[in-house]
Regions:
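Active-site rim elements
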Residues: 36-38, 57-58, 99-102, 127, ...
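Fungal secretory targeting signals
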Residues: 1-24
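Disulfide-stabilized extracellular recognition modules
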Residues: 108-211
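Short, well-ordered surface patches within globular domains
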Residues: 33-89
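Solvent-exposed loop/turn segments at secondary-structure junctions
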Residues: 51-53, 68, 77-78, 96-98, ...
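Fungal extracellular Ser/Thr-rich, low-complexity intrinsically disordered regions
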Residues: 17-35, 194, 199-211
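A solvent-exposed, acidic/Ser-Thr-rich amphipathic alpha-helical stretch
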Residues: 85-111
């Protein structure tokens, strides 16, 4: 992975532009977190998935606003603890919740990259599901093609872990049927993405809804 350091620098250092959305009411503690259609938020999530999926020979994902809206609705329920509401989901939470817009973007970025860190636990010689690596396997599941995510701030006086980040995937990964993990979770054996590709995807107006 000769270009890993250069690519990682690009992925981390991409500028965060000022939020462009209009503030809209929703059923959460406040509205400081970026909305699910925010380009900075989408870019932070998608660059992480794009990079790691390329290394694991998985197809590029496209952003699905319907999945993102579903993730936002489920976060808005503000269950006491974060809960998987459906198959094909990855969740992260933070306490205390991020305090400003830029911190929410960083939360989404670091959580997305953090899911890949579970790869060190994954037994390639005995592929199967366990919670210890379930975020990683969903992230790189090869026939998953679409993703939508959201963040939200639940009332810290009513819930634990009020800062929440949910991603929903289609097709859902972590299928425990015989042979699925062997077929869908490959090691990091494919070539690094090029620096040029990373630069293109660092642009704020990059269209993640298309391959």
């Amino acid at each position: 992975m000769k270009s890993f350091i250069t690519l990682a620098t690009l992925l981390v250092a991409s500028a965060v532009a000022a939020p462009s959305h209009n503030v809209k009411p929703r059923e959460l503690y406040n509205d400081d977190a970026p909305h699910a259609d925010d380009p900075n938020f989408i870019g932070a999530v998608m660059r992480a998935h794009w990079f790691w999926r390329r290394l694991h020979c998985a197809q590029d994902l496209v952003w699905d606003q319907g999945l993102a809206d579903a993730a936002r609705r489920d976060i808005s329920e503000c269950t006491y603890m974060p809960e998987h509401m459906r198959s094909g989901s990855n969740l992260s939470s933070q306490k205390p919740a991020p305090s400003k817009y830029e911190d929410w973007i960083e939360f989404a970025r670091t959580a997305s990259h953090g899911w890949h860190e579970e790869e060190t636990k994954y037994p390639y010689d005995h592929p199967h599901y366990e919670d210890a690596w379930g975020h990683f396997t969903q992230m790189v599941w090869r026939n998953t093609s679409r993703i939508g995510c959201a963040v939200g701030y639940c009332n810290p006086e009513q819930v634990d872990w009020p800062g929440r980040f949910y991603c929903y995937y289609d097709y859902a990964g972590n299928n425990i049927a015989t042979g699925q993990f062997e077929a869908q979770v490959w090691g990091p054996v494919c070539s690094d993405p090029s620096v040029g590709e990373a630069i293109k995807r660092s642009e704020i107006d990059y269209d993640w809804s298309r391959k």
